[in-house]
Regions:
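N-terminal activation segment of mature serine protease catalytic domains
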Residues: 3-63, 228
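PDZ/PDZ-like groove recognition
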Residues: 51, 181, 229-298, 306, ...
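A conserved glycine-rich beta-strand in the N-terminal activation segment of trypsin-fold
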Residues: 25-33, 49-72, 97-100, 125-127, ...
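C-terminal cap/linker of serine protease catalytic domains
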Residues: 30-34, 146, 198-253, 300, ...
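Terminal peptide-recognition signature
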Residues: 2, 43-45, 64, 71-75, ...
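Conserved active-site neighborhood of the chymotrypsin/trypsin-like protease fold
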Residues: 19-21, 68-150, 290-292, 309-311, ...
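Active-site loop architecture of trypsin-fold serine endopeptidases
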Residues: 51-53, 57-59, 79-88, 123, ...
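Short, well-ordered loop/turn sites that connect or cap secondary structure elements
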Residues: 67-68, 128, 134, 192, ...
């Protein structure tokens, strides 16, 4: 059995986005204060393909943020393989204690996931600030496990370099940009202001030497919207899907950019249509689509039951076509 079942919590009141304290100019609010406030709320997330033993090698690892005293943890969806069942999951807290955990739900569109630790109590939940109050140039720290659990609770310092930054062609999330170092293993960790409040969940880093010093975090306001729904329902309400698995592809020769289809859910909106594996989605609603970020922007304006016209390119014979589907709720 490769997963543990975890229930939602319909009575959850939601992540509380706190305002900055009134005495913001007090000198006590510095990196040391912020570090002390957040350290015990950061965990390591270790994912295993097989049973967890002392000799097991983890397949994926990242960081997470405790949001309730009984062990609900926010992390990135890609850390857990964008799946409820792919991995056995172990959580390691700041004091070295180990817990088994399961996936409550995940959202690939924002790269967020919610985990539940087994038999956990008395944990320190992180305080969250409101990312809408973030100021350019504001001092921040990033905390997580860069390079894995052996470097747990590593802290780097920086500033808020930009807000509402589109940094990825796989999501339409508008990120907080920082120059605080965010390295592999930091995924799912916290970006924290000097008041010890989480203002973002670390998600990605442009891994190129020309762009050193550009880290990105999912804003806490987005985290609240997504995680509150997952906690209550196990998924994000109101999201629609087309029922395909695919990947962004760039144009090459006569082949256009778009979303290459790897598989189609026969029970989904694209099942029993003319679309085939290896077709490339190039348009939706009359708009050109070259990546998932653009496609998600189109889907945001639709609800389950809406009709959506897709344009596609067939790689097998270089033909093009259109198909109309009925959108379903993504659960």
């Amino acid at each position: 059995m490769l997963f543990r079942s975890n229930k939602t919590n319909p009575s959850y009141e939601g992540i509380d986005l706190k305002a900055k304290p009134s005495d913001t100019k007090d000198s006590k609010y510095n990196t040391e204060y912020a570090s002390n406030e957040i350290t015990d709320s950061i965990v390591g997330v270790l994912c295993y393909s097989d049973e967890i033993t002392d000799d097991s090698q983890c397949t994926s690892q990242g960081s997470g943020i405790i949001i309730t005293s009984d062990g609900y943890v926010v992390t990135n969806s890609h850390v857990i393989g964008n799946s409820k069942t792919l991995y056995l999951i172990q959580i390691v807290t700041s004091d070295g204690k180990q817990y088994k955990a399961g996936v409550v739900g995940y959202d690939t569109r924002t790269d967020l996931a919610l985990l539940k630790m087994d038999d956990a109590s008395g944990l320190k939940a992180a305080n969250f600030g409101n990312s809408k109050d973030v100021a350019l140039g504001e001092n921040v720290i990033a905390i997580g496990n860069p390079g894995g659990i052996k470097y747990s609770n590593s802290i780097t310092q920086g500033i808020v370099s930009a807000v509402d930054r589109q940094s990825s062609i796989t999501t339409n999330v508008k990120f907080i940009q920082t120059d605080a170092a965010i390295n592999p293993g930091n995924s799912g960790g916290a970006l924290v202001n000097m008041f010890g409040q989480v203002i973002g969940v670390s998600s990605s880093k442009i891994a190129a030497t020309d762009y050193e010093g550009m880290g990105f975090a999912i804003p806490s306001a987005t985290v609240k919207d997504v995680i509150d729904d997952i906690m209550k329902y196990g998924y994000v309400q109101g999201r629609v899907m087309i029922g395909v698995v695919g990947e962004n592809v760039q144009s090459r020769g006569n082949i256009p950019a778009g979303i290459a289809i790897y598989s189609i859910d026969e029970d989904g909106p694209c099942g029993n249509t003319e679309l085939k594996q290896n077709d490339i989605i190039t348009g939706a609603d009359g708009k050109k689509i070259s990546n998932f970020a653009e496609f998600y922007d189109v889907l945001e304006s639709h609800k389950a039951g809406d009709k959506l016209e897709l344009e596609y390119y067939r790689t097998s014979d270089s033909s093009t076509g259109k198909v109309t589907i009925t959108l379903q709720e993504s659960k």
